[in-house]
Amino acid sequence: MPQELLLQVLPEIATNELLLKDYLSKQIKVSPKEIQHISILKRSIDARQKAIKINLKVAIYLNGEAFQEHKIQLPQYPNVTNAQEVIVVGAGPAGLFAALQLIELGLKPIVIERGKDVRGRRRDLKAINVDHLVNEDSNYCFGEGGAGTYSDGKLYTRSKKRGDVTRILELLVAYGASEDILIEAHPHIGTNKLPQIIQDIREKIIECGGLVLFETRLTDILVKNNEVQGIVTQKGDTILANKIILATGHSARDIFELLDRKQIFIEAKPFALGVRAEHPQSLIDSIQYSCDYRGEHLPPAPYSIVKQVNGRGMYSFCMCPGGVIAPCATSPGEVVTNGWSPSKRDQATANSGIVIELKLEDFKPFAKFGALAGMEFQKSIEQKAWHLAGETQKVPAQRMIDFTQNKVSSDIPKTSYVPGTTSVEMGAVFPEFLTQILREGFTEFGKSMKGYLTNEAILHAPESRTSSPVRIPRDPLTYEHLQIKGLYPCGEGAGYAGGIISAAIDGEKCALMIKDSIGK
């Protein structure tokens, strides 16, 4: 049996196999030559003290002990060409992992995706960045892989209660992700690596007899006697099935409007909204690592911060070390920000959403929209930001200290946000109560993270798509919609996930529930 150890070591030891072997040999009092293999099981950074340490959990195999490298392999998928069909609406993580699970269970997924495949999306991303043109069906939110494909590929989830996180991570490794995601405390694939993984998943679905239909947008759900019968697409095609997984993501406003129009029960849901702050990565490194220079053995530093301000949570969201701010509008006439990092996180700046918890009462000015009140609140801020910044994909921007002092910034340096920025006093973008909380919150952040509150930091507005503004209620036991039999609201857009991993888990669960219902 291997010996398992928990230890703290210097970064230069953790990143050098020979130094680590030497260190461990002294810990267990054997010669380095007696150590056959070291498996790193978990890895995280402890930056609480000036002397930064790496936390490791390792398994040590000595000579003569049985060691066999664990090779992660794909499940044995059956061919489902002639199996019962299930419609999956949306090819984000919830939809794709639902499709894979359906195949494992012997069911045939028909995946429809309003956007283009990962390669086709790139042309539309260039158009929004360079030409300020928003394709309503193909953008940073819509298209193969969903919003996560081109917004970082973070795999961290706080909730272990949602399901088997390890299974999802191992499936991603089997489809090409680095095995590092299995051991890192905050695993991350990177926007440059994720598209190929997504493409490989799609090819497996097709190879097994499933269908994936791009540029195919849901325009109607066929319902009879409160049971689904199928769907209609924008092409006028009808696809019949009595099981539908609705995994359309947090930005599919037309789907929320369709459900509301058909009187399929939905409800407003609180979400969070604010700005995206960009700092020099070197500054964040110096704050987090308490040093002037990060060195070669440490990764670009992340940060996580939360404060209670006027009875509301204000916190960092989707923090991207060495990353880029992206334009994530899904319709003309609005601007939206988000962030992403390449796998090496090697860009010069760090960015993070800094957002405030909203309450249902905040949506009262939009009460006439009923369950869509939160969505209309969200939309109003995005449209106002678009107008204030010049009615292109430029975003309102302001230096951080200037914002806290209610001063328009005299100049805005070039940031990672490619379409560009316009100097705007952020108080004009947000309702007064949000502006006040943001101002007080940044001042408090500056007290907790010395150096964070600086005019080197540029705020971009708005960060508004943190989660869905609508929940599509479902039975907690069957996962079916409370009102419509055979309709399975799924993932982030339905209000049951927050990120790639939790969405993938929810997709698998919906597939399992469908199989269970068929067996009854």
Where are the regions that the model predicts?
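Residues forming the flavin
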Residues: P2-I54, V58-Y150, K154-L171, Y175, ...
